[in-house]
Structures are given as structure tokens and as C-alpha cells.
Design a protein with these regions (language model features):
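Oxyanion-binding/catalytic loops of NTP- or PPi-dependent enzymes
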Residues: 1-170, 175-193, 198-212, 219-705
Length: 705
């Protein structure tokens, strides 16, 4: 995907030599970014808009935040409407340029304001500019909150008809529609199942909105360091699916950078920690990062050579700080309606905005205060919401949410297969993991661990270090032997005969990784083979998630079971799965790429794992039955080829073929019994039995459906 036309600022910078490596923490609540400059071996000096030096080793972190009175919106984008006549166009343009010049590298949230213009005031026709600008600050609540776009990260890459998007749309003030594209086969437009932001008479894809945010990070870095960004690493939750990851990479490309890499949030944080604090021995870390809409947990091992290995990862891509607001929102609103208040939610966007952000602010206040007050005058035009809230009240409302966080932590430790006593450090990131009661509960579980909670913006800084390492620009002795090993979230395999899954990469496999496995054809004179790639923990394809299909054509036509095919699974650092298939000893191959995390969110992943655990015994029994029936079927086919011309033997073979066709579900032992019976009724052929023995020994070769 091509990026936007290069800005004048970039054209005037020195030719890109990969000097600047940019790390971006694409959070739900804000975007923060950090830079590594290879020309500065140590402290990097950068001036902010107040002419103050920022010191932080060899990289800088400048965050983006917006203060909406009492709130910092999630990735807020303000699409404001202005009527402009022909006589005022030049004046408006100059004013806009002046405002943009003043933005500097303030601590801004991901807010973007898109201005609309009117060519003819008499017609009152709104025409919206495609190029938004970042809002610096709003002193009061916005006058048009329905044009403030937030939660871009959560919507990016979602399907329009997904249950998740349907659910979150209920709490959004701005409008989302399904994208429609021209259909070449008809005059009508066809639905794409892709959500877009609705702005009056036009729509804007969320990839485009996200690109404005990434472009601001890139422009700020280049403006202040007077050089071009070479590599960009964006950190995201580990559970982001293939569509979300690709959408983020596309957004960065739209912003003008082609060299983009993806890394998990928790991994990025540990990279920074390993760089900042010298580790003298192997240590185990539990790291938890809770944003506005996600919870990431991981158990990681770091040795003294700065080799970072993720042992397990988990959490919930739909659980975050907003969940702690919901019980309070429900309590306040129900009390307000019961006391005679008017229903204002969704009916009055501005007052709804005030109400929701006041609840968010109250939650934050209770982090450092024991009591706070929500005071909203005439919220419905007539009645007030005035409510005093203590920490104890808030904790009681969120007991179930606290328990759920602890469950996620317990699960990720269990999957790491280490003893809890081996943990040395616990790192808590994100504002929601500063809630006093939640910190207390986690502390009680890990009393002997070193707690680290005051590390701000370390995810973006870790991403910047990784960007430098990725571009071979990390001129640091500390990270001379630096390596990162992440893991696959679910098992990956292909469907084989009998609907069985042949696992090629088990869940928790270290990435990057490349594995090849051999298979055989299942039909005589087969011309092509279809491979179906699945992820999941169940034994049968119908119980797992289909990732992709590839077809290998032009294979050698021969008897079934004689043509050997190689299937290769390769997962890179971005969790991108590439599948290749070729006939053994032939150069021709086919391949396809898919993200190893597929289309599932963390909740679906956890559900699949739980189902797989409960069904494991049943699946294993069914698998054994299917394999036994296939062995009998193979024997019938071989005897048909060997003795098909002998009428007496043919009738015996046909008898067992009919039994197999009508047997239904029988125990594995019954298939084995029939197989032995059939072998005893056939003439003994030494060559055949020698071949059977070799087949038993060659267990690595399986049949492809």
C-alpha cells in the first residue's frame, strides 16, 4: 500500500540512512512514541515546545494526550464542521497553519480534528477535508462530541457484522456504517463487512484515521531530531488477530513508512527493562499491562545475555479499564432515573459525553484519593447527578472484575509450567493496574517478588529499542547478544484423511520457527491436493478455526500413497504464518500467508482451550477409532489390488468392505479385530508383509485428504 505524498518537512530532511528508529505504543487510551538515534551513543538531547531538554538515555518518549475538561479520550479524533465562504478561505488556511505550527511535541492524546469547508455559504453545503489535524487541547467538553472518534484501536480491523462491534457500538456517540463499494457486475454497491466512520455525506476508513495518529508520531520525531525515521515498530496486544495486525501495518504505510514491524506490548516492556537494568542472572518476570480495553499478561524469562523468552501469554483483548467504569455507570444512571431524571443517554451526545468522562475521572481520582465526588448540574436539562464515592464503594462494585484479573494471572502462570516460587519480578503497567485494591490483591499473591509499578512509557521505549535492533542500528554493548523469542498462541496444523488434524506447530512453539512435515496422496492418479490450514487444540477440523486453503497442482500422477508431499509452516516475528507445499524433490511450490493468531480474539482463544481440555479424552478415543478404520480401509485397498482377479478372495474382501461401510461408530478394537481377520484369510505374501512392517515404522508420513 502506497503512503501519502511526502510532506515538505520530510523532503527537506537528510536522506534516510536508518538513523531514527521509532517505537509506537498504540494504546487504547493514548499513543506514546519513543526514538532511538544511532548517532547519539548515550544521552539524547531533544527540546520540547517549552525549550526544555528531555534526558532519557539514548531515546526519547513524547506522549500524546488531550484534556477534555476532565477526560482524556481514547485515540480521540474531533471532526469539526466549519462554514467557510470564498472570501475567507485564505484567512482560514493561514490560521490553520499557525495552529499546526504550535503543536510541538506536547503530551497529546490521539486526537484528530477534521475540518469541513463550504465553497458557497449561500448553499450551506458541507465539504469535509480529508486531511485532519491533531487537536492540541480542549478547555471544555466538545460542542459536537458525535464527531469525536475514539477507540480507533478497538474498531480497527473488526468486521462490521461481528458481535463485538455490535456490542461496542451501543456505547459510541459517533456513527459507524458498513463500507460499500462499486460492484463491477451490477450498478448497485456491495457491502464489504468493513466498518467506516460516518461523517455527514462521506465516510472515512479506520485505517485512514489511524494513519493520522501514526503520521503525527513520525512528523514529531523527524521535526525535532532533524532526520528521517527509518524503521517503525508498533506494539499491540498479543491477542490481536490477523486482520487487526494487517490493518495497523497498512495504517503505518499510509502514514508514509514502509518498514514497519509488529511486537507484543508485554515483550516490548521487557525489552526496555532488560536494556535499562543490567541482569546478572536468569530471572523470571510476570508482566501485566491493562489498557482501556485490553488486559495482557505474560511470563517471561531473561538471562544475563539479554535473551528474552516468552514462556506463556494470555489475558483478554476485551477487558480493560472501561470494565471498572461499568458498575458505577449502571448504579448512577439507575439511581438518576429512579429519582425522576430524564433519559439522556445517547439522546444528548454532549451530556452523555460529560457523564461518561466524569465517571472515568472519578475512577482515576480514587487512585490517589480516598473519596471523590461526581457533580453534574442539570445533566438532562432539569436534574443533577451528585454522588460521593469512596474507595470502598468502588472496590465493592468491582469485586468480580478484580477476581477476573487474578484468574487471568493464575492461568498464564499455569501455562508457563514454572512454579510460582520461581518468579522474581512482577511488572504492572497501565493506569488501571494502579487501582489500590487491585495492586493489593496482586501483591498478596506474590509477596516475595520485586514489584515494579512506576515505569511510564516503557512499552514505546522498548519498541524503539527493538526498531533499532531490527534495523541493525543498535550500537550498544548491552544488547550485543540480544534476542527475543515469542510463542504461538494456538496449535497450527492441516486437515488430513478422516477429518483429523495433523499438528505441525504445537501451541506455545517458540517463534520465529520453521517446520516441514511429509504427507502422502490418498487417491490414484491424483493431479492436485488441497491443504486446509487450521488453528486450535481439538483433534478434528470441524472443532477448530480455518485459517486458509492452498492447492498444489501438477503433482506426479501415480498410485495412492506413492507421491510424497512436503508442507512447511513458518511463523516470523510478526506472528505471520507462511504455508508452503511442494512435491518432494521438485522445485515447484505454492505458498500463502496468514497471521498465526487468525481471526480470533483472546476470549475465543480461552474458550477454545477450555473446550479442548474438557473434550481431550473424547477426542483421543475418536481419533483412535478413525485411525483404526483407516488402517482397515488401507488393507482392503491393498488386497483389492493384489487379489482382485480371484473371485473367491474378492468376495471375502467385498464382505469386509461392506462391513466397514455400514459399521457406524464401533470401538477401535473392533476395527483392529476385523483387520487381523482379513489378513488371516488372505494368502501370505512375504513381500506384502515386509512392506506392512515398513509402513508401521514410517509413522511420520500421513495421508492428506
Amino acid at each position: 500500500m502506497e503512503g501519502e505524498e511526502e510532506s515538505e518537512q520530510r523532503k527537506n530532511l537528510p536522506k534516510d540512512d536508518g538513523t531514527l528508529a521509532l517505537g509506537i505504543d498504540f494504546g487504547s487510551c493514548r499513543i506514546s512514541s519513543a526514538v532511538w538515534n544511532k548517532n547519539k551513543k548515550g544521552t539524547q538531547l531533544v527540546k520540547d515546545q517549552n525549550k526544555n531538554d528531555i534526558y532519557f538515555d539514548a531515546f526519547l518518549s513524547f506522549e500524546k494526550e488531550i484534556d477534555y475538561g476532565m477526560n482524556r479520550l481514547n485515540d480521540g479524533v474531533d471532526i469539526s464542521s466549519k462554514y467557510i465562504d470564498d472570501e475567507k478561505k485564505e484567512e482560514e488556511k493561514n490560521e490553520k497553519e499557525k495552529k499546526e505550527e504550535d503543536y510541538g511535541i506536547d503530551r497529546l492524546n490521539e486526537g484528530v480534528e477534521v475540518s469541513n469547508k463550504q465553497k458557497d455559504e449561500g448553499k450551506k453545503e458541507e465539504v469535509y477535508d480529508d486531511k485532519p489535524h491533531i487537536i492540541k487541547e480542549l478547555k471544555e467538553f466538545p460542542s459536537n462530541p458525535e464527531n469525536v472518534v475514539y477507540n480507533i484501536k478497538q474498531i480497527l480491523g473488526q468486521k462490521y457484522n461481528s458481535d463485538y462491534l455490535k456490542k461496542i457500538k451501543q456505547n459510541l456517540i459517533f456513527k459507524i456504517e458498513e463500507e460499500k463499494k462499486e460492484d463491477e457486475k451490477s450498478e448497485n454497491k456491495k457491502n464489504t463487512n468493513r466498518p467506516v466512520f460516518k461523517l455527514k455525506n462521506k465516510t472515512i476508513p479506520f485505517e485512514k484515521l489511524a494513519s493520522y495518529l501514526f503520521k503525527k508520531c513520525i512528523d514529531d520525531a523527524e521535526k525535532n531530531l532533524k532526520n528521517k525515521v527509518g524503521n517503525v515498530v508498533v506494539s499491540i496486544p498479543h491477542s490481536f488477530n490477523k486482520i487487526q495486525r494487517q490493518a495497523i501495518k497498512d495504517a503505518v504505510r499510509i502514514a508514509g513508512i514502509e518498514n514497519v514491524h509488529i511486537i507484543n506490548d508485554t515483550t516490548a516492556a521487557l525489552i526496555y527493562y532488560a536494556f535499562k537494568y543490567h541482569i546478572h542472572k536468569t530471572e523470571y518476570f510476570l508482566i501485566c499491562d491493562m489498557g482501556q480495553n485490553k488486559l495482557d499478561c505474560a511470563v517471561v524469562r531473561i538471562n544475563k545475555q539479554n535473551c528474552i523468552k516468552v514462556l506463556s501469554s494470555g489475558g483478554d483483548n476485551r477487558f480493560g479499564g472501561e470494565k471498572f467504569n461499568q458498575p458505577l455507570i449502571k448504579l448512577l444512571y439507575e439511581n438518576f432515573i429512579n429519582d425522576g431524571g430524564n433519559d439522556f443517554l445517547k439522546k444528548n451526545p454532549k451530556e452523555t459525553f460529560k457523564f461518561l468522562t466524569s465517571v472515568e475521572m472519578a475512577k482515576r481520582n480514587l487512585t490517589f484519593m480516598k473519596e471523590t465526588e461526581i457533580n453534574l448540574q442539570k445533566i438532562d436539562g432539569e436534574n443533577d447527578i451528585i454522588h460521593s464515592l469512596t474507595r470502598e464503594d468502588f472496590d465493592k462494585l468491582n469485586e468480580k472484575n478484580y477476581a477476573y484479573v487474578l484468574e487471568c494471572i493464575d492461568q498464564v502462570i499455569k501455562e508457563s509450567k514454572i512454579d510460582r516460587s520461581q518468579l522474581n519480578n512482577v511488572i504492572l503497567l497501565g493506569e488501571s493496574l494502579r487501582i489500590p485494591k487491585l495492586v493489593e490483591l496482586i501483591g498478596e499473591k506474590f509477596e516475595d517478588c520485586n514489584f515494579i509499578t512506576e515505569l511510564y512509557n516503557i512499552i514505546s521505549q522498548g519498541a524503539a529499542i527493538y526498531a533499532a535492533h531490527w534495523g541493525n542500528k543498535l550500537n550498544s554493548d548491552k544488547f550485543k547478544n540480544f534476542k527475543v523469542y515469542d510463542i504461538t498462541q494456538l496449535s497450527l496444523g492441516i486437515r488430513t484423511e478422516g477429518d483429523l488434524i495433523s499438528t505441525i506447530l504445537p501451541r506455545g512453539s517458540r517463534i520465529p520457527i520453521k517446520v516441514t512435515k511429509s504427507f502422502l496422496t490418498t487417491q490414484d492418479h491424483q493431479k492436485k491436493v488441497k491443504f486446509e490450514v487450521y488453528q486450535g487444540e481439538r483433534k478434528f477440523s470441524k472443532d477448530n478455526d480455518l485459517l486458509c486453503r492452498i492447492i498444489l497442482k501438477g503433482i506426479t500422477e501415480n498410485s495412492r500413497g506413492t507421491v510424497e508431499l512436503d508442507v512447511t509452516f513458518e511463523v516470523n516475528e510478526d506472528n505471520i504464518l507462511t504455508v508452503k507445499a511442494n512435491e518432494k524433490n521438485k522445485n515447484e511450490e505454492v505458498q500463502i500467508s496468514a497471521f498465526a493468531n487468525g481471526n480470533m480474539d483472546e476470549e475465543e482463544v480461552k474458550k477454545l482451550i477450555e473446550i479442548a481440555e474438557r473434550a481431550r479424552k473424547e477426542d483421543e478415543e475418536k481419533e483412535e477409532r478413525v485411525k483404526a478404520s483407516l488402517r482397515l480401509y488401507e488393507l482392503i485397498l491393498k488386497f483389492t489390488t493384489m487379489f482382485g482377479e480371484n473371485e473367491e478372495l474378492w468376495s471375502i474382501i467385498e464382505e469386509y468392505r461392506n462391513w466397514l461401510m455400514h459399521a457406524g461408530i464401533v470401538p477401535k478394537q473392533e476395527y483392529e479385530k476385523k483387520r487381523i481377520e482379513l489378513m488371516r484369510k488372505m494368502p501370505r505374501d512375504e513381500e506384502f508383509y515386509e512392506e506392512e512392517k515398513k509402513e508401521e515404522e514410517k509413522k511420520v508420513v500421513e495421508a492428506v485428504a
